[in-house]
Amino acid sequence: MAGYLPPKGYAPSPPPPYPVPSGYPEPVALHPGPGQAPVPTQVPAPAPGFALFPSPGPVAPGPPAPFVPLPGVPPGLEFLVQIDQILIHQKAERVETFLGWETCNMYELRSGTGQQLGQAAEESNCCARLCCGARRPFRIRLADPGDREVLRLLRPLHCGCSCCPCGLQEMEVQAPPGTTIGHVLQTWHPFLPKFSILDADRQPVLRVVGPCWTCGCGTDTNFEVKTKDESRSVGRISKQWGGLLREALTDADDFGLQFPVDLDVKVKAVLLGATFLIDYMFFEKRGGAGPSAITS
């Protein structure tokens, strides 16, 4: 103000000991415009005694954990550890149904709760299927849902009948393929179908005893799984009745296999092989020779 004079005794304040900025600082370009170089983000230095941790972000996936096999369980048979029932469904083949031409059998396996366990496929030549019928030699490959072969069943050619103790049927069980874990051996009996469940050293572990008449009409046909001295039953192999038309026109059968949940996995696998052998011996029609249940 023109002509303003400070009052008497007024003295100006001394300057501060720190620099006084003049004007406003230039703003930091966090989002540079066109033609401007991006400004790197400045991370403040950590306070004394504190470490600086990186900000959370996507973590790169590491290598997969190595698979640890269960002790005493062949690789691929882990699905047998926690189950006590297997349902086996044989697929119906149209060529076999309408033309009577014997084809390789195909099966689906599920647990008692409906969980898919895998598929089994027969491998045999056409001449053996036509000439030997249900007695034909074959190889069955059982693959898990990932199409990995985990079990192999081998049946050699044995010509014989139940009325004499020669040419008894047999099946070898391998898991993994190439490693024998047991055998299924038919035991001679004049009236009853009997089988011995053997371990890799061909020592008996269990017995399977069937009924005198296996051609059940309207009911299931049960084969009891018993201890090796046949004193008590520990499981069952059941051929389930599929209906009059299906039983008369097709060879497609349904089986149920029951065993204790704490049974050795290898013995469970051999019992599975026994189920397939029973299907071929008693419920598979012979090529041009009538039902195998009469002559096996």
Curated annotation (Swiss-Prot):
Catalyzes calcium-induced ATP-independent rapid bidirectional and non-specific movement of the phospholipids (lipid scrambling or lipid flip-flop) between the inner and outer membrane of the mitochondria. Plays an important role in mitochondrial respiratory function, morphology, and apoptotic response. Mediates the translocation of cardiolipin from the mitochondrial inner membrane to outer membrane enhancing t-Bid induced cytochrome c release and apoptosis. The gene is Plscr3. GO terms for cellular component: cytosol; mitochondrial inner membrane; mitochondrion; nucleus; plasma membrane. The lineage of its organism: Eukaryota, Metazoa, Chordata, Craniata, Vertebrata. It comes from Mus musculus (Mouse). A motif (SH3-binding 1) lies at residues 7-15. Keywords: Apoptosis, Calcium, Lipid transport, Lipoprotein, Membrane, Mitochondrion, Mitochondrion inner membrane, Nucleus, Palmitate, Repeat, SH3-binding, Transmembrane, Transmembrane helix, Transport. Palmitoylation regulates its localization to the cell membrane or the nucleus; trafficking to the cell membrane is dependent upon palmitoylation whereas in the absence of palmitoylation, localizes to the nucleus. It comes from the Eukaryota. It catalyses: a cardiolipin(in) = a cardiolipin(out); a 1,2-diacyl-sn-glycero-3-phosphoethanolamine(in) = a 1,2-diacyl-sn-glycero-3-phosphoethanolamine(out); a 1,2-diacyl-sn-glycero-3-phosphocholine(in) = a 1,2-diacyl-sn-glycero-3-phosphocholine(out); a 1,2-diacyl-sn-glycero-3-phospho-L-serine(in) = a 1,2-diacyl-sn-glycero-3-phospho-L-serine(out). It is a single-pass type II membrane protein. A lipid is attached at C159, C161, C163, C164, C166 (S-palmitoyl cysteine). This is Phospholipid scramblase 3. InterPro entries: Scramblase. Its main location: mitochondrion. It holds the Pfam family Scramblase. Residues 12-24, 35-45 have a biased composition (Pro residues). GO terms for biological process: apoptotic process; cellular response to lipopolysaccharide; cholesterol homeostasis; glucose homeostasis; mitochondrial membrane organization; regulation of apoptotic process; regulation of release of cytochrome c from mitochondria. Monomer. Forms homooligomers upon binding to Ca(2+), Pb(2+) and Hg(2+) ions. Interacts with PDCD6 in a calcium-dependent manner. Interacts with PRKCD; interaction is enhanced by UV irradiation. Residues 1-266 are mitochondrial intermembrane. The Proline-rich domain is required for phospholipid scramblase activity. GO terms for molecular function: calcium ion binding; calcium-dependent protein binding; lead ion binding; magnesium ion binding; mercury ion binding; phospholipid scramblase activity; SH3 domain binding. PANTHER family: PHOSPHOLIPID SCRAMBLASE 3, PHOSPHOLIPID SCRAMBLASE-RELATED.
